[in-house]
Amino acid sequence: MEAGDIFPNYTGASIINLPASVCRWLAVQPFGAPPLAHDWLSNIPGQYDQVVLLLIDGLGYDFLTRIVAGDFSGVRGLEFWGDRFDECPLLPLTSVSPSTTCAALSSLWTAAPPLQHGMLAYEMWLKEFGILSNMISFSPASARSQTGGLKHSGFDPQRFLPLPTFGDHLSGQGVETIVLQHTSIARSDLSLMLSARSEVYAFRAGSDLWLSLAEILAQPKGGKRFIYVYWGALDELMHFYGPEDERVLLELSAFTLQMRYFLDKLPKQGKKPLMLITADHGQIHTPKQPAYDLRNHPQMANCLTIMPSGESRLPFLFVRPRREDRLRDYVEKTWGKSFPMAAAETVLTSGLMGVLSVDHPHRERLGDWVVFP
């Protein structure tokens, strides 16, 4: 962690500032972190009866600006993004750290940075259950094909977060909250954790998503609505094939054409809903390299009490007593400046993941050292 590093802007330019902004557009009481900074809010004036937030997992700002600039002009349909942003603002936001999906979505739904809601990473040490857990499947991190295994140890997804969720808040304000997610995750533990007090619609394909959304918007309203749409297919393909693989571009093209069909069919008269499009994070190409595989570094593994948690691009290290100097020397000699390390206490007070006291229970999930590959 050095001068010049880019931190999430939790005070007005992060995804955690979206809930309070949505509250402002719906004209209800704010929730959690402050709304987006005035420069951002001024681009979207007015108040609305319905707000739609579409989250496209993995569609980061850099990738989107390249699409808008025409870098992928050979892929039919993507020109829509450049055409649309002639009339709609494109505003850069920071995610959270770490920007992995479970941490970022938890921040979005609690309007709080990761240290406060406790979902710190994709894989996390949970002392209360005595396990290194995958925080998407909520099973042991080593159980590759299992989902929900943590429930056998008493885990309750609806009681795990220490903070209220956005759905809780909106329900108390008389706002109906609707969540549209793919059927494969619509009632997963992570979805149950985040979508409390929400009516969940499970879609099976992009066509199902857009037609269902159109039907929901056309339903008579008894009050105000917040509609959250999560689309994860792009991120899944990026993880398997890389962020600019042709499959990724074709999937986004098909999704864009269906979205365009939906937008063209919206009623031209009457009060229109506000539609926001955001992401939880972007992606960069990170090829597998044997030099970074911990199985090839037994000397480093011998310095640890458990295997690294966190995620590949932000590992948390739990170090055996009297092995810290040996660990740091090994990392420095093996990878040099490409793997800087910071003590967990430094991260706790830096603001990178929010701020937390060193004696808070969430502190134990961070380990002793954090690596920044």
Please tell me what each predicted stretch does:
Residues 1-373:
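Feature captures the catalytic ectodomains and active-site-proximal regions of enzymes
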